[in-house]
Amino acid sequence: MNRRSFLQRASVTAVGFGVLRNVQACAPAPVLAPVTPLPATFTALRDRFFIFHLQRNPVTSTYLGGDGYSPELADSNMRLRDYRPQSLQDEIRFYRDVKAVLVRMAPAAVAPAQPATVAPSQPAAAAPTVLAPLTPVEQIDYRLMNAQVDFLIHQLGDLRYYQRALDTYVQEPFRGIDWQIQQMPDLGNGLLGNESDWQAVLIRAQAIPVYLEVAKANLLAGKTAGNIPDKRMVQRDGITGSKANADYFRNTLPKTAQPFLGTRPFAQPMLAQLTAAGITAGAAWDAFADFLSQTYDVNEAVDRFASGEAEYEWRVHNALFDPRGAAELYEYGAAQVALYTAKMVEVAREFSAEAKMGLSFNTDAEKNIGIRRVMDFLSKDSPKDDNQLFKWYRDAGERAVAYGRQFNLFDIPAEYRLEVVPTPPVLRSAIDAAYYPAPPFKKAGAGRFYLTPTGNDPAALKLNNFASVADTAVHEGFPGHDWHYRYMNQHADQISNIRWLTPGAVEDSSAMWTDSMPTEGWGLYSEELMAEPRPNHKYGFYSPGEYLYELQGQLLRAVRIRVDVGLHTQRMTFDQAIDYFTEHVSFYPNARLNAAGDPTARAIADSAYRAIYRYSKWPTQAITYNLGKNAIIELREACRAATGAGFSAKTFHERFMGMGPVPVAHFRDTFLAACTPA
C-alpha cells in the first residue's frame, strides 16, 4: 500500500469523526531524559527504577495496573512503547547508571548464591565502595533488581533484540487494549468503564499506525545487520498475527465495545471514533502483514530460533537463578522424563487391569502401546462440541474448589468463582490454555482463564476428553494460577513493587521469564498437591483416569526441559523436537510423518508443533515449570524438617504465595530462617 495515500485517507476518516484533536497521541511520546541524580538509598532507587521501567513499557504498566499505583503512570494506558532508537538508547543509559549505583551500594551479605549475573558484554563488577545495610526483604529485592537490570542492558544493548522482536510488536497493541477492557470498572447492567477509560483505549488504538512504522524501521535495520526473526515467527506471529489484529481492530473491538458503552451520552460518539480508529489500525496491520511478506522469506532453509548455549546458560543463571549448565539440565530433563513415564506405566497397568483391557506392560514397546491404549480408551469420552468442552472445564473448576474446602487446603471465600473464556484469536497460535491475572495495583478487573476453542474439530476434541480436563483446570484455575494470583493481589501491598515487574515484556519472546519460576512452578506444584492421597482418595482429587493425565502433565513439563535445552543449544532440530514430544508426551511415535493420512496423528502433530514453536521463541520459559515446582517442594520439605511436628502446609503455602512472583532461590535462606519449632 502507498504510504502517502494511506495517511491521506486516514486523515479524511479522522476529520469525519472528529478525531484530529487526538492525532498527536498517534505519535510516540517525547523521549524522556532519565532523571538524575539517582537516589543513594536502595529503596528509593528501587522505586525510581520501577516507575521508570513502567513509563517506558506502558503495556506492562497496563498489565500491572500501573495507573492505580502512581500518578506518574496515569497516562500509561494511552500509550504504546516508544521503540525509536534514541528512546531505547536513553533507556539503556538509565539502566547502566542504575547498575553502577547498585554496584556501589551492594553489601557483602547480598553476594549472589548463584552464578554471577553480569551480562556478557559487561566487565566483572568492581567491589562495592559503599556498604549499605539492607533488611532481609531489601536483600531479596536487591538480588532480583540486579538481575533485572542486567537482563535489560543485555537485551537492549548487546542483543538489540528490538530489531527482531516481531511477536512483541504484533502482540503488544492487542494485549494493551485487551487488558484495559479487562480492568474497566463494572458499572452494572452490562456497562464497563467510564468515558476516560474508553478515551484511553481510543488514544492507544490511534497510536498503532505510527507504532508500526517504527517497528518496520527497526526490523529493516535488523535485517541489514543479520538480526532476523525465525521464519516460523514471521509467518505465525507476524503475518498471521497481523491479519488477526486487523480483524480485531476493524471488527471485534467496536463490536465488543458497543454493549459495554451502552446508551450513555458519550457512547455513540465514542463508538464512532473507535470504529474509525479500528478501520485505520486494521489498514495499518494489513500493510504490516504485506511488509513482512515482502521483507522476509518464510520458506528459507535456515532456522534462526536457537539462542545458543552461552546465551541460554546466561539466562538460566541470571534470570532463573539456577546454577546448572545446559548439559546438566539436558540430562536432568531425560531423568525426569524417565521418572514420570514409569509412574504413568504403573497407573496405566492398574487401570487396564480394573477395566479388563488385557494389556501387557512387560517390554518398553508394550509399555508405550499400553499407555496409548488406555488413553485412547479414555479419549472416547470426548466433548461433542466446544460448548460442552467449556462446560466441562467450568465444572472441573467448581469440583476442585469443593475439594479444597472439603480438606481445608486453603481458606477459600464463599464467593470464589473461576471464569473460563475463549482465547482471543491473536493469541491462539501459541497457547491451548493459559491464565491472565487481574492487575495487582488496581481493584477493578478479574483474572481470565483462556481456553482455545477447537473449532469443533473431532480429532482436537478427542484430545480434550473428560479425563484430561481436571488437570488443566487445576493448573490454570484452583489452586493453580487463579488462586495464586488472587491471593497475591489481595496482599499486593505487602509485596515489593519490583517483584511484579516482567522485564522485556509480559509474555512474548522479549520476556525475561523470572516470574515464571514461581508462578508456573506453583501451577505445576498445584497439580501434584491435588494428587496427594487422602482417606478414600487414592489419587487425591483425581479419578484414576484423571490422575493418568495429571502424570502426563508432569511428563510434559519434563519433556520441555529436554526439548527447550535441545532446541536452543542445537542438540535438537525443530522436527526432532516435535518427534521427541509426540513420542514421549503423546506416546505416538512418528505422528508428524503420519499426519497426512491419520486425523489423530495430525491433531497430535499440530498440537506438538504449536508447543515446539512456543518453546523455540521463548528460551528458558519452558523449563520454569518443573524447576519452579521442585524448588517449591525442596523449600517445603526443608521448612517441614526445621519446623518439626508443628509444620502446617496451609501456613507454608500462604507464606510462599505472600513472597510474590519471585524465584525461591532469591528468598530461600530468609524464608527458612522463620521455619522454627513451635
Model-derived features: positions:
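N-terminal export signals
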Residues: 5-28
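N-terminal maturation segment of proteins
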Residues: 27-678
